[in-house]
């Protein structure tokens, strides 16, 4: 049970709290503005046009794509092939096929020798994406790992080492992906699932 601390009537506690909150919001806004300005200033990596392996991966999809899926995939690929860092929001109802759209972007990233990461809000969702990705990439030499509380300390340490060495192509995880001890050798794509469940500072 959360107990909210109330300010006394006629006191200065509430006024100080508001001043502190405003200052924190301004600092965060300044940081975000600086970050977006830096993104626009610094060129990103322009991914290569689709390769035969990309086509083979997409043809292995068990279902027929919807028009919305195909449009989203085409737009994301076009973004990835530009030198400006991609910042795209993909919205869709449950069952829309967003995961397949994301995995095709992952494949495009990995084929250019880059690493990809999928950040999710819950351990259950991390395991679901891990199982889906393992099945989807089963015929391709793509190493996939999941970082969550189900891993032992030794397993977590090994995953961190392998990510830094570039031995992991796709890493899926919860907030553990945000830890300062995690370093990628060459991260080319970050996908945030259910991004509304992460704060602006995290993102």
Q: What is the predicted function of each stretch?
A:
Residues 87, 101-130, 138-143:
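Conserved SF1/SF2 helicase motif Ia
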Residues 102, 129-130, 179-185, 195-203:
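Conserved ATPase-coupling elements of RecA-like P-loop NTPase cores
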Residues 62-86, 100-101:
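N-terminal pre-P-loop "Q-motif" helix
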Residues 81-92, 100, 113-115, 168:
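Pre-Walker A (Motif I) flank of P-loop NTPase domains
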Residues 150-171, 178-187:
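Conserved motor-coupling elements within RecA-like helicase/translocase cores
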Residues 174, 193-194:
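Walker B catalytic acidic pair
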């Amino acid at each position: 049970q959360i107990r909210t601390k109330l300010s006394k009537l006629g006191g200065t506690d509430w006024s100080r709290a508001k001043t502190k909150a405003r200052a924190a919001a301004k600092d965060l806004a300044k940081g975000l503005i600086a970050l977006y300005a830096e993104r626009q200033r610094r060129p990103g990596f322009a991914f290569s046009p689709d390769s035969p392996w990309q086509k083979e991966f997409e043809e292995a999809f068990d279902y027929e794509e919807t028009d919305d899926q195909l449009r989203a995939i085409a737009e994301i690929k076009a973004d990835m092939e530009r030198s400006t860092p991609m910042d795209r929001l993909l919205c869709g109802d449950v069952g829309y096929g967003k995961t397949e759209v994301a995995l095709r972007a992952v494949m495009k990233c990995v084929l250019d020798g880059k690493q990809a990461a999928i950040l999710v809000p819950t351990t259950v969702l991390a395991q679901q994406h891990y199982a889906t990705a393992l099945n989807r990439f089963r015929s391709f030499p793509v190493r996939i790992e999941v970082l969550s509380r189900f891993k032992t300390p030794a397993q977590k340490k090994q995953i961190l080492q392998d990510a830094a060495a570039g031995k992991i192509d796709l890493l899926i995880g919860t907030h553990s992906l945000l830890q300062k001890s995690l370093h990628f050798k060459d991260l080319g794509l970050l996908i945030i699932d259910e991004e509304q469940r992460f704060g602006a500072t995290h993102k």
